[in-house]
């Protein structure tokens, strides 16, 4: 197996409290390595376009957060899968916090799905290394050359038509490639799998998946993990139930997901129409604008981290003006870099709820209005036309805006997945309703979705919902309980009594579940996960056996 990794010490110093150099000049307690692991299976080719996944993309990708100095033994490894349009950077704050809590007795591995290999991070890396975010703007939007390289732009969808086959099976086999780096004898006792949003569904899919030739041979995912962690996602049922006819060749149909409109194609349409292979192309938005939003977020986050109190000039960048106008209805206001990030991602201003956090509020005149871009959604907007400078206050925050800006500033990963494959959404929705086949004759099993072992999945589960997020009640988690047998080590007691813990975090948005400030409460999500992992792990893992 070919493994590529980079020790990221040289770029970790920007993470406050969890970096190679802290504010007092001492060595930080967290190291990060970026891994790309060659997979040992073949992704099918697009049978219509006759295109195959290139060999350079046949890698599973993750980032390993571990303590410095590295201990000889670990109590557990937590592996985290991001959600829809999410990248490994979503877990940056959570990973560093959990690693530091026990001084290294828990490692965290954050998954970047293989589409991250399509990203060109040259401009962001140069911007960070020079502490000059304007370099990223010049590289991505003005044709600037960095180290002899110019930005080639968004890949033409005709050149990535092979992504029609990047569905559930490939995603879970990539995840299994990562988990398989840990020796078998430690997995069922010391490896925990979690996910956020759609990633929570993928985590429970993995637990119920069969990687063998079922029923002749079985290789269930739950035998590789000690527990499952659901973060504002998962449970039973995703959006609605899909028929086989809709999946294979149905007409296009529209869904509303937290204010964003998706027009979802069938499998045959994804294969026939290259423009539909990435989910950004399905939004009721101009695709380049939506992809620019991801770049905009990272650059504005870097400005907010490096120069929080300086007046922002990113608002006036031509490529971003359309985004600012769509979100805020005003491009003439002045704001500090930190306030600009708040305007971009705080729940008062961001109309797409799955991309918002509770960061505080702006200091300056505001108005409440209905978003012109997302009908029916009420947001706040700045009203001043440049006579004063908006600043940011953190009163009432749940997520620390500095933690969010640090995660957005990552240049070894991203907080978003620009090229999220549509096929993975299609497969995930197909598993809605009763959530997964129970027989090999089920059409979903026949289409390669081998989520067959819910009735045998005995790993313990802990689930978190956001009171202002996606899972606002316990209902979908309770429905999931009904699919599962008693948990291991629960002496046959039903899941309602043992082996399934549910917490709804009051007023948390979808991102607050990941980024909530641990200083606000000792009973925060990070601490609850850490303590739950220690309660459910057995023995230890020698770090000498890890990659």
Where do the model's predicted regions map?
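Bacterial Sec-dependent N-terminal signal peptides
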Residues: 16-27
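Alpha/beta-hydrolase active-site loop
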Residues: 128-184
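Gly/Ala-rich beta-loop-alpha elbow adjacent to hydrolase catalytic centers
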Residues: 194-199, 203
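Alpha/beta-hydrolase
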Residues: 239-468
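Short, surface-exposed "cap/lid" segments of acyl-processing enzymes
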Residues: 67-133, 138
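Conserved alpha/beta-hydrolase "acid-adjacent" motif
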Residues: 89, 470-479
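N-terminal cap/lid segment of alpha/beta-hydrolase-fold proteins
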Residues: 25-70
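Catalytic active-site module of serine/aspartate enzymes centered on a nucleophile-bearing elbow/loop
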Residues: 447-450, 456, 488-547
């Amino acid at each position: 197996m070919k493994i590529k990794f980079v020790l990221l010490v040289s770029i970790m110093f920007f993470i406050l409290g969890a970096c190679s150099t802290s504010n007092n000049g001492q060595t930080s307690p967290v190291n990060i390595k970026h891994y790309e692991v060659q997979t040992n299976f073949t992704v099918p080719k697009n049978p219509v376009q006759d295109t195959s996944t290139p060999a350079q993309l046949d890698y599973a990708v993750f980032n390993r957060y571990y303590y410095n100095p590295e201990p000889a033994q670990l109590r557990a490894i937590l592996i985290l899968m991001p959600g829809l349009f999410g990248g490994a950077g979503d877990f940056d704050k959570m990973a560093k916090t959990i690693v530091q809590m026990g001084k290294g007795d828990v490692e965290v591995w954050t998954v970047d799905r293989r589409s991250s290999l399509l990203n060109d991070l040259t401009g962001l890396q140069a911007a960070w290394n020079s502490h000059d975010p304007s370099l990223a703007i010049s590289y991505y939007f003005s044709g600037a050359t960095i180290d002899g390289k110019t930005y080639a732009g968004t890949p033409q969808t005709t050149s990535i038509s092979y992504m029609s086959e990047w569905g559930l099976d490939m995603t879970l086999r990539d995840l299994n490639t990562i988990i398989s780096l840990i020796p078998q004898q430690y997995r069922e006792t010391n490896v925990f799998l979690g996910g956020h949003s759609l990633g929570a569904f993928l985590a429970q899919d993995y637990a119920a998946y069969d990687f063998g030739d079922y029923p002749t041979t079985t290789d269930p995912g739950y035998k590789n993990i000690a527990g499952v962690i659901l973060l504002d996602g998962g449970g039973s049922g995703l959006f609605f139930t899909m028929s086989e006819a809709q999946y294979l060749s149905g007409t296009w149909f529209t869904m509303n997901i937290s204010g964003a409109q998706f027009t979802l194609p069938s499998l045959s349409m994804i294969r026939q129409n290259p423009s539909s292979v990435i989910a950004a192309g399905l939004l009721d938005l101009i695709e380049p604008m939506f992809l620019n939003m991801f770049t905009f977020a990272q650059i504005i986050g870097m400005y907010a981290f490096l120069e929080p109190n300086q007046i922002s000039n990113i608002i006036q960048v031509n490529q971003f003006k359309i985004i600012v106008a769509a979100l805020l209805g005003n491009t003439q206001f002045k704001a500090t870099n930190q306030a600009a990030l708040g305007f971009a991602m705080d729940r008062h201003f961001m109309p797409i709820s799955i991309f918002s956090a509770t960061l505080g509020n702006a200091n300056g005149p505001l108005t409440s209005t209905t978003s012109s871009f997302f009908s029916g959604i009420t947001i706040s907007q700045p009203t001043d036309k440049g006579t004063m400078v908006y600043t940011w206050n953190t009163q009432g925050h749940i997520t620390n805006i500095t933690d969010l800006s640090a995660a957005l500033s990552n240049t070894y990963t991203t907080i978003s997945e620009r090229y999220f494959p549509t096929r993975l959404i299609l497969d995930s929705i197909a598993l809605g309703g009763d959530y997964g086949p129970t027989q090999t004759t089920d059409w979903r099993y026949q289409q390669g979705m081998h989520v067959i072992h819910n009735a045998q999945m005995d790993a313990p589960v802990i689930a978190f919902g956001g009171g202002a997020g996606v899972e606002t009640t316990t209902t979908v988690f309770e429905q999931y309980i009904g699919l599962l047998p008693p948990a291991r080590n629960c002496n046959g007691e039903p899941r309602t009594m043992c082996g399934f813990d549910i917490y709804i975090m009051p007023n948390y948005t979808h991102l607050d579940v990941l980024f909530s400030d641990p200083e606000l409460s000792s009973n925060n999500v990070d601490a609850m996960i850490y303590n739950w992992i220690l309660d459910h792990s057995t023995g230890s893992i020698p770090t000498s056996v890890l990659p």
